[in-house]
Each structure stands twice: as C-alpha cells, then as structure tokens.
C-alpha cells in the first residue's frame, strides 16, 4: 500500500508550550472570525512532547496518522505499507523550529493563508513527526528510495534515447528528455529528494 503525501493531511491536534504544554482550541471570535484559546494543560502530557520548550512553541499531535497507519498495516497481511511525506524524526525537533515552517496551508496547489482563515476552503498540513508513529522497518530519503528502485537506470535510458533522436526528436524522444529533468527534481536533496520514505513490512 502506497501513501504519497497523505499523513501530513490527516487531522491533528495542536499543542502549544505556555509554561507547560496546552492543547490549542478554536473558538468563535464573534466577528465572523476564529481565535485560538489555551484553556487546559495536557494531562497526562504525551510522551513525545519535550519537557521544556521555548514559550509559544507548537507541535502537532498526530493520532489521526497513527490510526490510519495501524489500519493500513492490518489490511496488508503480506507486503508493505510505504509512506512518502514531509517528515521530521522527532516531535522535539518540530518544537525547536518556527512552527510556520511545518504547519502550512494550501489552496489550489498554492500556499494559503493563516490556518484559522477560510475554514473549508484550504488544506491544513503538518510535517509528520516520525516518533509518534509505530517504528518503521526502513526509513530512507525519497532520493535514496528512488535510487534503490532503479531511477538511475531509467535516467540513463532517457539520456541515451534523447541522444539518439536529438537531431529529429519525436514525442517519444521528448518524453525521454522529460524523464531526465523530472528525475532531477525528484532527487533534489534541497527539495523533493529530501522527502521521507518509511516502510512497514509484513511477512
């Protein structure tokens, strides 16, 4: 089973550090907008949360991702569940970086506005904290995963086909040239190549 950029889209709770970890709730501000409140401390505090963090630090609590993954693994009795996504190794790492770098909104395949704006009209996503999921059997970058499954050979084939037909290229030759360029984007360590690919294997 393959899940490409799925877990980061699943619903999550939001924890905010304000002298201790509190869950962020959303309330109607009374003027047609929504506001955040922090009414209660998290008790018990989830084990993934660091004991201390900078004031205002935020992290996602991703029970939805864990629930989906548990269900997927039950369905795949012999095979593997493969997840490709924005991810960080630990929840503590998310707490230590600006939260707007991991909590993002999208509308029409472009970045959206503030996460409390336009409910229902934009997607809210969060980097996946790997330590909140069951421990995977294999973790690779997307670049490593694609190289493991032969992308370098496909690129070499594309280069040869383009070189052979470059003088009078047809649609097939142009597709081979596109293969080379697409691979560069997929393997870019500063971009898509840095995606995390995690695998849970059932024998």
Stretches found by the model and what they are:
Residues 45-203:
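Long, Lys/Arg- and hydrophobic-enriched amphipathic alpha-helices
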Residues 2-50, 96-107:
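A mobile, often basic/glycine-rich helix-loop segment
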């Amino acid at each position: 089973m393959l899940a490409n950029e799925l877990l980061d889209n699943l619903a999550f709770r939001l924890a905010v550090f304000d002298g201790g970890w509190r869950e962020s709730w959303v309330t109607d501000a009374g003027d047609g907008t929504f506001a955040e409140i922090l009414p209660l401390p998290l008790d018990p505090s989830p084990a993934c949360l660091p004991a201390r963090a900078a004031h205002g630090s935020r992290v996602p609590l991703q029970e939805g991702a864990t629930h989906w993954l548990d269900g997927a693994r039950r369905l795949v009795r012999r095979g593997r569940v493969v997840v490709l996504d924005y991810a960080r190794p630990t929840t503590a790492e998310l707490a230590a970086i600006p939260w707007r770098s991991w909590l993002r909104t999208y509308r029409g395949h472009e970045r959206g506005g503030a996460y409390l704006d336009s409910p229902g009209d934009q997607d809210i996503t969060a980097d996946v904290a790997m330590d909140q999921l069951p421990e995977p059997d294999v973790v690779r970058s997307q670049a490593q995963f694609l190289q493991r499954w032969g992308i370098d050979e496909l690129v070499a084939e594309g280069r040869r086909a383009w070189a052979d037909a470059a003088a009078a290229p047809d649609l097939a030759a142009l597709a081979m040239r596109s293969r080379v360029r697409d691979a560069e984007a997929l393997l870019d360590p500063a971009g898509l190549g840095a995606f995390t690919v995690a695998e849970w294997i059932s024998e």
